[in-house]
C-alpha cells in the first residue's frame, strides 16, 4: 500500500549530502555489446523536510565537468558540445517537491524535473531508504539508493556513430544510479 511522503522515521529539517559517503554514477550501452560506466565527482544535494510533507523539497546540482569514466579522452569528449557542452551548461540540476514523493515501506518513488543542457524533462527515481540513524558523532544521518532511466536524446545529447556491423556506438537509454548519505543540519 502506497503512503504519502510520511515515513516512520520522517524528520523535519534541512539535510545535506555527505559527499565522502555518496556517489552518482551512470551507465549506457556501448558498441551494442557492453556498457560504459562513469561517475560525477562533484555534486550537491539538499533536502528540506517540512512539517507539511507536501512542502518538502529536493534540490540537487551536478558539476558535469566532473564526469569521470576513467579515460581522459572520453571524459573530454563528454564535456564537449557533442555531449554535456560544459562551457555553456556547467550544471545539471534535479528538483522535486513533496507532493511527488511517495513511500511504500522503505521503497520510494520521486518524480521531479531534470535539467541538462538547458532542457528540462520530468524523470522518475525509484529506490530504497537505507535507514535513519544517530551516528557516534551526534549527527542524524539517512541513507538511500535509487536509480532513474533517461533518454539522452530528450536533452539534446544526440551524438552517435554508426557501426560497420550495424547499430550505433551508444545507446539512447542512460541509467543513473544514486547512493546518497545525507546529514541533518543542526
Task: List where the protein language model places each region.
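Low-complexity, acidic/polar, glycine-enriched regions of mature
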Residues: 1-186
Amino acid at each position: 500500500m502506497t503512503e504519502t511522503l510520511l515515513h516512520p522515521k520522517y524528520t523535519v529539517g534541512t539535510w545535506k549530502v555527505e559527499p565522502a559517503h555518496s556517489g552518482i554514477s551512470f551507465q549506457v550501452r556501448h558498441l551494442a555489446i557492453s556498457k560504459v560506466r562513469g561517475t560525477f565527482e562533484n555534486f550537491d544535494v539538499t533536502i528540506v523536510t517540512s512539517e507539511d510533507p507536501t512542502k518538502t523539497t529536493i534540490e540537487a546540482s551536478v558539476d558535469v565537468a566532473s564526469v569521470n569514466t576513467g579515460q581522459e579522452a572520453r571524459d573530454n569528449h563528454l564535456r564537449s558540445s557533442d555531449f554535456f557542452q560544459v562551457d555553456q551548461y556547467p550544471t545539471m540540476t534535479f528538483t522535486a517537491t513533496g507532493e511527488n514523493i511517495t513511500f511504500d515501506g522503505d521503497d520510494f518513488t520521486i518524480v521531479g524535473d531534470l535539467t541538462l543542457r538547458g532542457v528540462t524533462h520530468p524523470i522518475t527515481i525509484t529506490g530504497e531508504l537505507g535507514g535513519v540513524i544517530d551516528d557516534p558523532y551526534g549527527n542524524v544521518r539517512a541513507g538511500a539508493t535509487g536509480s532513474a532511466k533517461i533518454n539522452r536524446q530528450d536533452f539534446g545529447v544526440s551524438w552517435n556513430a554508426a557501426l560497420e556491423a550495424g547499430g550505433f556506438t551508444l545507446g539512447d537509454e542512460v541509467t543513473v544510479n544514486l547512493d546518497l548519505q545525507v546529514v541533518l543540519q543542526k
